[in-house]
Every structure is written in structure tokens, then in C-alpha cells.
Amino acid sequence: MRIASSIVLTSLAVSGCSRHAPDKMSFFVTSVATGSGGSLGGLAGADAHCQRLAEAAGSRGRQWRAYLSAAAETGQPAVNARDRIGKGPWLNSRGIQIAANLEELHGANNNIGTMTVLPENGQRAPFPHDILTGSNPDGTLAVGDMTCRNWNSTSGYAMFGHSDRQGGRGNAGSWNSAHQSEGCTTAAFRETGGSGLFYCFAAQ
């Protein structure tokens, strides 16, 4: 009986581990925020956060990009989140495809929702559903001050998406353009159900 129990427990452990597929992963939501509200160190800082988390989870040989848009600055054009993330397909941290290409990702038939938006570690632990994007539903830069001063400040505002596509505010069913934040501090994010998390995609 003891041997049989041991075999069962071992099988369950292996089965549990096999569900996490970092070698296939090309999409995740950050498991932790940077801790500085909307001041992420710009797009470069957000990308670096994605890269660190992905590699810590076991992903290798991929270039990770934060799904964030940014406004034009002196000598720099505006940046659309959709233009930063490659062409797809994208799979979550358990190997489930969320979209085949950019059109599907930003259309009605993507596979984004409560059961598929997972952090890089593959765990389904609850997390705040307000996800930073600064974007419109089509993945372009949101109009107005919606990027926390291009992700360099705790001043201004951000556009959130809803990872679970639920809620009673704004365009609640949108994964990338649900509503505006109350500000760009961590405390302001928390007022509507956020903490400063964002989506990461493998661009290659």
C-alpha cells in the first residue's frame, strides 16, 4: 500500500510539472509588478522585466517584449503595442495557444480569458485583473495621456485591459483596453483592481 501510494504521488507530481511548458511559452502576464507603479523604466525597462521573469521560469532563446504602447517624443515616433510583439502564434505558459496571429489576437476569436492568461510560472493563483497596456482594442496607442508618461512616471494615467474580460466598468470585456486608471501610482492602480502587471510576448 505504501509503495502504491508513493507511485500515485509521484505520478501526480510529474503530471503537475508537465503542465508548465516554458519551452513552448510565448505569452504570459507578469507574476510580479516592478514595484514602482507606472514608472517601469520606459519600454526598455518593461522589456527587461519580461525577459528576467521568462528566463527565471525556464524560457531560453527568446526575445521578450512588453505589450505596451508609448506616445511620440522628441525625435521618436509613437509606438503601438501590436508592433512590438512579433507575428505569432503565441502560447501561454502551459502550451495553450491564445492567438495565431495579430489579427486573431486583436479580434473576437482570440483565446484570452481567465483560464488562459497565466503568469510565466504557469500557476493559476488569483491576481489583479487590471493589466497595463496604454492601448486601444486594436493594439495601437490609446488617445490621451494613457501611458504614465511613457512608462517613466507615477504621474498621469494608464489604459488597462481586463485579463479575465469581466467587470462593470468601461469596456469591461476587453483584454487590452477596458478603462483608464485613477493615476500611475501603485495605490492608484489598486483602486480599480490593478497592481502594475503587464502582458509579455515573445517577439521571436
Regions found by a protein language model. Give the residues of each.
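Bacterial N-terminal signal peptides that target proteins for export
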Residues: 1-7
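C-terminal motif of bacterial Sec signal peptides marking the signal peptidase cleavage site
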Residues: 14-16
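Secreted/extracellular ectodomain signature
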Residues: 18-204
